[in-house]
């Protein structure tokens, strides 16, 4: 059946209400001792586990997983000589498959510590309501019995949009998860990744960097949807529009990880600009979007050189480095499914397609799924692409072959085809079994019996 956006909205509203009930009074990451590494951590190898703890996942579902863990691990920023630490959250469903691992890219899209999934997925619905949609997608994998790991890929600098940082920290999160001996996961488990929007940046760069940074990981597929693969094109698309707040978040992430860009912007950005860029480092994405609707970041009140700051050589050098497909060295060596709506009003379709073309030219195996219905905007495609992305990754985890080379596919749907998921997902309720008190994982008959009565 086709689930309308109205039904999806009702599901989301109900989930939000339950998440409010589930909220715990948790210390924010900057006040939580778990996030502070022990002495000597800098000398450890990347991916080394420094701390671990059991946690409850309280966004959407509470206590219905078999277990959940968090790992503090050693990682880096853009280069090997920039050591840092971050956290990944591991969710283990009942009847979990121990030969498969899903790296899930949460689209937190802001730099504040309390926006990271290691906090929002424990605290319930706080200021970051995007966690509701992230959980809905992750539930597809959990219900199928896949262990899910979700790295805080922006690290301590809130590096939203800084792809090399996100990719490295995600790969090290996978390393840490595979090395963790308390969840029964095979050390050579098949690995896939799923990410949309900001999660698409994460997953796209994880795929691109894996060959050079973590070649030992047994990755078999990556899904990246609605991907802002070119940050220059992203800024040009959303500046002055309703989603202009993402400009502030993205600029802050790049500035925090490129010292030469910071040195330049410190000279040309106004005091007001500095205040504007601080906001996404303290607030989550919906607050950021609501703070800056229709703001023109090219205005002289923000930049003394107007729009020229974006095209200053030192800025363009960084943004070119952060454009997927520009460097042949960073070409995925594992099959990729890209999905994008032709009417995407945030992440330009043309830029994502150019990344597809570049990766294909450099020898990658990529499928590009275009949602060609005129209503296929960024938010709509978050929903419509979730099932194809899940099914494609499931095929990879099950060892089904993928067509070599590249191909393009067109999808005319404007809704989500839940029939494609099989009988366990005959209803929207099938995605929300955890909400009804049932255990999360395969082979649970409670809801299915209830639906067939």
UniProtKB/Swiss-Prot annotation:
Activity regulation, per record: The activity is significantly increased in the presence of Triton X-100 and partially inhibited by PMSF but unaffected by univalent and divalent metal ions. Activity is significantly decreased in acetate buffer compared to that in citrate buffer at the same pH.
Primary localisation category: secreted
Enzyme class: hydrolase
Catalytic activity: a triacylglycerol + H2O = a diacylglycerol + a fatty acid + H(+); a monoacylglycerol + H2O = glycerol + a fatty acid + H(+); a diacylglycerol + H2O = a monoacylglycerol + a fatty acid + H(+)
EC number: 3.1.1.-, 3.1.1.3
Biological process terms in GO annotation: lipid catabolic process
Keywords: Disulfide bond, Glycoprotein, Hydrolase, Lipid degradation, Lipid metabolism, Secreted, Signal, Virulence
Activity under varying temperature: Optimum temperature is 30 degrees Celsius.
GO molecular function: triacylglycerol lipase activity
Any one Gene Ontology cellular component term annotated for this protein: extracellular region
Keyword Disulfide bond: yes
Family: Belongs to the AB hydrolase superfamily. Lipase family. Class Lip subfamily.
Function text: Major secreted lipase involved in Dandruff and seborrheic dermatitis (D/SD) probably via lipase-mediated breakdown of sebaceous lipids and release of irritating free fatty acids. Has triacylglycerol lipase activity and is able to hydrolyze triolein, tristearin, trilinolein, tripalmitoylglycerol and trihexadecenoin. Hydrolyze diacylglycerols such as distearin, dilinolein, dipalmitoylglycerol and dipalmitolein. Shows high esterase activity against 4-nitrophenyl palmitate and 1-naphthyl palmitate but not 1-naphthyl acetate, suggesting that it specifically recognizes fatty acids.
Record's protein name: Secreted triacylglycerol lipase LIP2
Originating species: Malassezia globosa (strain ATCC MYA-4612 / CBS 7966) (Dandruff-associated fungus)
């Amino acid at each position: 059946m086709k689930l309308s956006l109205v039904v999806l909205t009702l599901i989301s509203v109900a989930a939000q209400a339950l998440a409010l009930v589930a909220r715990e009074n948790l210390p924010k990451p900057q006040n939580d001792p778990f996030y502070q590494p022990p002495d000597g951590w800098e000398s450890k190898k990347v991916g080394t586990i420094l701390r671990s703890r059991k946690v409850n996942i309280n966004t959407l579902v509470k206590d219905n997983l078999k277990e959940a863990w968090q790992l503090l691990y050693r990682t880096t920023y853009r280069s090997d000589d920039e050591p840092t630490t971050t956290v990944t959250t591991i969710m283990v469903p009942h009847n979990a498959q121990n030969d498969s691992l899903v790296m899930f890219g949460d689209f937190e899209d802001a730099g504040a510590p309390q926006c990271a999934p290691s906090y929002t997925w424990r605290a319930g619905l706080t200021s970051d309501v995007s966690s509701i949609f992230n959980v809905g997608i992750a539930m597809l994998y959990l219900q199928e019995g896949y262990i899910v790991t979700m790295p805080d890929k922006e690290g301590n600098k809130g590096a939203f949009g800084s792809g090399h940082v996100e990719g490295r920290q995600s790969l090290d999160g996978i390393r840490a998860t595979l090395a963790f001996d308390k969840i029964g996961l095979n050390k050579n488990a098949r690995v896939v990744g799923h990410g949309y929007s900001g999660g698409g940046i994460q997953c796209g760069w994880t795929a691109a960097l894996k060959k050079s940074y973590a070649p030992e990981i047994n990755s078999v597929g990556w899904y990246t949807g609605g991907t802002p693969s070119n940050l220059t094109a992203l800024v040009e698309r959303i500046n002055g529009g309703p989603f202009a707040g993402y400009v502030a978040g993205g600029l802050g992430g790049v500035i925090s990880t490129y010292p030469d860009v910071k040195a330049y912007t410190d000279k040309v950005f106004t005091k007001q600009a500095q205040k504007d860029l601080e906001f996404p480092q303290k607030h989550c994405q919906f607050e950021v979007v609501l703070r800056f609707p229709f703001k023109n970041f090219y205005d002289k009140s923000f930049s003394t050189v107007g729009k020229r700051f974006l095209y200053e050589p030192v800025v363009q050098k960084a943004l070119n480095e952060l454009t997927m497909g520009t460097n042949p060295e960073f070409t995925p060596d594992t099959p990729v499914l890209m999905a994008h709506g032709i009417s995407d009003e945030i992440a330009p379709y043309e830029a994502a397609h150019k990344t597809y073309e570049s990766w294909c030219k450099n020898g990658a195996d990529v499928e590009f799924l275009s949602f060609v219905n005129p209503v296929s905007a960024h938010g709509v495609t978050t929903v419509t692409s979730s099932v194809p992305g899940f099914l494609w990754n499931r095929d990879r985890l099950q060892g089904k072959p993928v067509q070599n080379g590249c191909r393009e596919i067109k999808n005319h749907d404007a809704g989500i085809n839940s029939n494609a998921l099989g009988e366990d997902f005959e209803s929207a309720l099938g995605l929300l079994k955890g909400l009804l008190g049932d255990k999360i994982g395969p082979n649970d008959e409670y809801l299915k019996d209830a639906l067939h009565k």
